Amino acid sequence: SIQVAHVISRIGDNTVDALDAVYPAAPDDDDTPRHGPTWSPVEGAPRVPVLVRDRHGSVTHIDAQALVDVAARLDAVITVDVQAGQFATSGQQVARVWGRTQVEEADLKRIRRLIWLGGERQLRQDVGFGLRQLVDIAERALSPGINDPTTAVQVIDEIHRILRELVVRETPSPYVADPDGRVRVVHQPQAIDGLIELGVREIAHYGSDSPRVLARLTEMLTDLRGCALNRYGSTLDGLLGEISKAGSAAAGQEKDRP
């Protein structure tokens, strides 16, 4: 319907707007991953857990730069154990402060406040939320009681638009350094490979008996393969192989029917 098409388009618009702020464009003619400073904990190193207190919800925003300031002041490293879009509840560990045996409650409270929780997911740092909404629409359209491949194809069109933006960009480094180049924060950005899979796998599963859906997914992935950074090639090729197998299996089942 026109209303559903409008919803699909609006989700796509909002998702493309959000990804600009999260995923940097790769340098022109440079498909080599950029390596900055890294960090890993020394075995047995002291650390203090940061637990959610009297709250619950989806992680809507992680202020990595403000966490860098806190970590530098403590002369520590803060690892963030949750990702944008992930649910966290009271008592759950959301971060650790490494290199300290104790941390003042005021600093723990500050760290907790820099990992924002909301009543529902938001697109601010959570591009996966936009894709999740679109995939859910396609899954409902492909359910046996509805069987609306046209709407599913409209969703794939919008996912194509989003993924075409993503496959020419880089997943941000999980390591965030202070001005002196020392890693102070380690977080978990949503990986672009995972977002590609999110936008394809479930639709391919629920649309496995729809030639239109499988054909549109194949068309999309083939186009993405031609423009994507080389680092995403294996993910795209793997998905193309899965869809080819799904189509062959569906054709075989159809042939076996009396």
What is the predicted role of each segment?
Residues 1-79, 83, 92-258:
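Short basic (Lys/Arg) and small-residue
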